[in-house]
Amino acid sequence: MAHIGLNEDEARKQNLDVIIKKLPVMAIPRAKTLGETDGLLKAVIDKNTGEIVGCMLFAPDASEVINIVAMAMKTGQDYTFLRDFIFTHPSMSEALNDLFAL
């Protein structure tokens, strides 16, 4: 499990207009090859700016994948950076393409 930034409730309490994206781990090819398909990836995105304001990962290798999201957030990238980034296949990080596909 890994988390960065705001969760959905925290974002709404700050009056942010957010888009919530979810991806079940069973949809990730690498999770299938690992035989670990339980879990969920969830992203909180500011609808007006495209900024990633939070991300929660309940998945294999979450402690590694969250670092990629953190880097995107800290360098001011919007969600399209991770949506369009080319990741190796199969990898847990490639799930970020699907998570951030709006």
Feature-to-residue mapping (PLM):
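Flexible, glycine-rich terminal cap/loop adjacent to redox cofactors
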Residues: 1-7, 12-102
